[in-house]
Amino acid sequence: MPTFKQLLKKPRKIVLTKSKSIALIQCPQKKGICMKVYTTSPKKPNSAERKVAKVNLTNGKSIIGYISGEGHTLQEHSLVLVRGGRVKDLPGVQYHFVRGVYDLHAVGTRKKSRSKYGKKLFKAPIV
C-alpha cells in the first residue's frame, strides 16, 4: 500500500471504461434510416435465419442492427430507433432496433414481455 507522500508524487490512475456501443456517442438511442434489410446465419452451434438491417445513423455512422421478435415491417428508407446491445451469435451486430417506434411496428401477437417488443396492454371491454 503506498504512503501519502508516494500518492502526492504520483496519484492513482483512473481506469476509463470503453463504451461497447461507440456509434451512439454517449446517447441512449439514435435515429437511423435503413439502407438494406436482410437475413444472416449465426455462428457455429446455432442455426437460424436472423433478421438484420444496415442503418445510417443521424450522426453519419453506419451500423448493423438486429430486428427482434417475430415478423417485421422494415423496408429500405424506413426510420428506426437504435439502442445498444449485441447479439452473441451474430458477429458484427452490436445494436438492437426498438420495436413500436417510427416505422418498425410492435410485435402484434405478443402477450408476455410486451415492453421489449412495443406492445400495448390489451384490456377487454367491460360488459
Curated annotation (Swiss-Prot):
It is found in: Mitochondrion. This is Small ribosomal subunit protein uS12m. It comes from Chondrus crispus. Protein S12 is involved in the translation initiation step. One of its GO terms (molecular function) is structural constituent of ribosome. Belongs to the universal ribosomal protein uS12 family. Its main location: mitochondrion. InterPro entries: NA-bd_OB-fold, Ribosomal_uS12, Ribosomal_uS12_bac. GO terms for biological process: translation. Keywords: Mitochondrion, Ribonucleoprotein, Ribosomal protein. The lineage of its organism: Eukaryota, Rhodophyta, Florideophyceae, Rhodymeniophycidae, Gigartinales. GO terms for cellular component: mitochondrion; small ribosomal subunit.
